[in-house]
Amino acid sequence: MCSHFTQDFLPVQGIEDSFHKLILRRYEKCGHDNLQLRKGCKSMNVCKVQKGVYNGINKCLSNTQSKIFQCNARVKVFSKFANSNKDKTRHTGEKHFKCNECGKSFQKFSDLTQHKGIHAGEKPYTCEERGKDFGWYTDLNQHKKIHTGEKPYKCEECGKAFNRSTNLTAHKRIHNREKAYTGEDRDRAFGWSTNLNEYKKIHTGDKPYKCKECGKAFMHSSHLNKHEKIHTGEKPYKCKECGKVISSSSSFAKHKRIHTGEKPFKCLECGKAFNISTTLTKHRRIHTGEKPYTCEVCGKAFRQSANLYVHRRIHTGEKPYTCGECGKTFRQSANLYVHRRIHTGEKPYKCEDCGKAFGRYTALNQHKKIHTGEKPYKCEECGKAFNSSTNLTAHKRIHTREKPYTCEDRGRAFGLSTNLNEYKKIHTGDKPYKCKECGKAFIHSLHLNKHEKIHTGKKPYKCKQCGKVITSSSSFAKHKRIHTGEKPFECLECGKAFTSSTTLTKHRRIHTGEKPYTCEVCGKAFRQSAILYVHRRIHTGEKPYTCEECGKTFRQSANLYVHRRIHTGEKPYKCEECGKAFGRYTDLNQHKKIHTGEKLYKCEECGKDFVWYTDLNQQKKIYTGEKPYKCEECGKAFAPSTDLNQHTKILTGEQSYKCEECGKAFGWSIALNQHKKIHTGEKPYKCEECGKAFSRSRNLTTHRRVHTREKPYKCEDRGRSFGWSTNLNEYKKIHTGDKLYKCKECGKVFKQSSHLNRHEKIHTGKKPYKCKECGKVITSSSSFAKHKRIHTGEKPFKCLECGKAFTSSTTLTKHRRIHTGEKPYTCEECGKAFRQSAILYVHRRIHTGEKPYTCGECGKTFRQSANLYAHKKIHTGEKPYTCGDCGKTFRQSANLYAHKKIHTGDKTIQV
């Protein structure tokens, strides 16, 4: 106020009092403590003389105010008290202005006014371009820049431009890594105040924004705005490229980048670029290992708040999203959205390289890496690289053996959530995916997709090497490895490598002994769910796969597929070493081990090595005595299921496989194939020791025991060891008297099926083998092979002790006992021992008095057929054995042998 103007009307003290009252009336809300007059400004005389009447007072007042207010925290002059108070609250953190609706406090009255507009729903500012409404004029101006593309704020470091100065300021923190905002409760620092506020809301659970329609509350006003559009159905943004309508401008901006391919947000660590900044923020946490969001129930930490939000539903069991088609519920709306495409068949994302379409954009991105070969995620333990971070995370659990997913019903833990879900479906029987063509239901959507290709015949993948067409990309990738020989999946226990990760997983269970799949009927456990699925058909008797050629049915489609090759003669798998072809890839693999000598499976009991795990399993059953497969007809139990099948066919007489050369029928295709080698003379398996060749690899294996003298099969009752399991079984039958094979014609029983088969030919008179040399007809292939050696003089079985050779291996075995003194067959009555079971068999007749052979001439009976044969010569007068020295004749060769000693004078042998 000007002293020249006022001194005529008021005294000086009165003017000063009036000034103070005016100031305090204007700023009465601020409090006396916040006002401080500067030195030299306590009187009104400091103002120079001003011209004017009453207006001079206000002018003088405004001029004086610029000098009288200062901040207590630091010496700073303000032109108005409001600025002084604002600076002070910035230092103290005071929030004087409180919202009556939600209780939130603010430092500035203008912020409170702005906040109240959220509750009132007031949006007075409208965009002329799109018609979008805003609560504040600044937001409208900001929004207009989307349409104009104006970005006046540029980063000097990287050249990136922004439409807001605040965005530029926040962006600069990426370069200098500044974190200006700290959480008071947890001492965490953030680069942006919004991140700090979001972090606080997670811990406090504060959700101030509530939907008027349904009452749902949100942490952020933007989330509420987005949610409200669900009720209104408002989608104001339409994409010119694909026609998609989108509800928010930010989502619209992100969507446009799908078409342009723009990825403006780049990671400084690895150089990977992203189309949205939030994805970059989430990606950075891969490098930093930061997981700021922790579950209060189980303590699990997450990189993203959204993942924590969804994770909580595991504990609550909440699945708020329901499919209208099948009623399936989901924890996330995104999963429901993707699930619906199963019913609609929609696949909007297409690969430009191969034309394959996908229901999810992430699946397309994942697929593209097949073509590029990109594997950016590397394991620090073993160096293995992956094309997705989830695969790397899952892989790491191999090293850590972490199993975070536990089945609540059965307590089993799994390393992958997919394995847990699969495990649950096995027990619940849930099959949500149904084929529209035939109604068949499946546990997994991928199984349904694979099945649907049966109806469509679609096989989009063709192998350039062999021309094979394949239905799925994963199967195609596996198939290519057959030609390349690539085995990228290696077992850390034994070093064995595999072409697929699933095969490695199954293989690992050999080392761990894990058998997670259990049969509900018999309790038998399996390493693979597929084997359990097929095993169940043993109990149900289901054989859904039928051969069109011969009508034979199978439990597995794979068995039918292989079986068809018997009719077609197809052998697509060829050995590069010897050129031999096979109908099955597994047979080729097994055959290759003959050349390599590879034996990966070792028996812990006896230390023996095996080529196949099934052989090892079979060996184990010898020691455990386990025989899980039981015949329903006679109750006999078997160790391998193949023996039960063989036994069943003997009882039923089933012989589906017939030889085109001689008409002989067999119960198994392998027996037919083996038989064919008699006609072809094929013997591909050769012994390195003696050069002897065999038609079967197992015959070669057993033959080698002649040289090594290995006897792996031991009788538990008597302690005797044998080189062959058949010899052990035969030995056991001698002691037990077990005779399981009965002739339907005469009722005679036999210990071995081969003996029954030989016996039956007496009734049928069937003798399919005819000798070209002498015309003799013979009943069995083994006897025919022995007979031919009479003409050829071949004696391939040689005694290592004395060098004597024999025409058959059985004769050699019997001969060896002369040197060893071994007499394995003992009479239970008198304890006498014999070298051969046949001699024991005849000896027993002494005790039983049995004489089954009767002379037709005189009625005399004999224990042995040989004795009857010799006796008959008395009636006929036949004496076929002649002495070369004196011409005397004899009925028996033994008598001739004794007579010769008269001429030689040898008295060492007496008859």
From Swiss-Prot:
Question: The cross-link Glycyl lysine isopeptide (Lys-Gly) (interchain with G-Cter in SUMO2): at which residues?
Answer: 478, 649, 786
Q: Which GO terms describe its biological process?
A: regulation of transcription by RNA polymerase II
Q: Which Gene3D superfamilies match?
A: Classic Zinc Finger (3.30.160.60)
Q: Give residue ranges of zinc fingers (C2H2-type).
A: 69-91, 97-119, 125-147, 153-175, 181-203, 209-231, 237-259, 265-287, 293-315, 321-343, 349-371, 377-399, 405-427, 433-455, 461-483, 489-511, 517-539, 545-567, 573-595, 601-623, 629-651, 657-679, 685-707, 713-735, 741-763, 769-791, 797-819, 825-847, 853-875, 881-903
Which SMART domains does its entry note?
ZnF_C2H2
UniProt keywords (A-Z) are: DNA-binding, Isopeptide bond, Metal-binding, Nucleus, Repeat, Transcription, Transcription regulation, Ubl conjugation, Zinc, Zinc-finger
An example Pfam family from this entry, by short name, is: zf-C2H2_6
Molecular function GO labels: DNA binding; zinc ion binding
Nucleus as UniProt keyword: yes
| SUPFAM superfamilies, A to Z | beta-beta-alpha zinc fingers
The protein's location, in the record's own words, is: Nucleus
Q: What are the GO cellular component annotations?
A: nucleus
Q: Could you tell me what this protein does?
A: May be involved in transcriptional regulation.
Task: Write down the PANTHER family for this protein, in alphabetical order.
Answer: C2H2-TYPE DOMAIN-CONTAINING PROTEIN-RELATED, ZINC FINGER AND SCAN DOMAIN-CONTAINING
Family stated for the protein in its record = Belongs to the krueppel C2H2-type zinc-finger protein family.
Q: What is this protein called?
A: Zinc finger protein 721
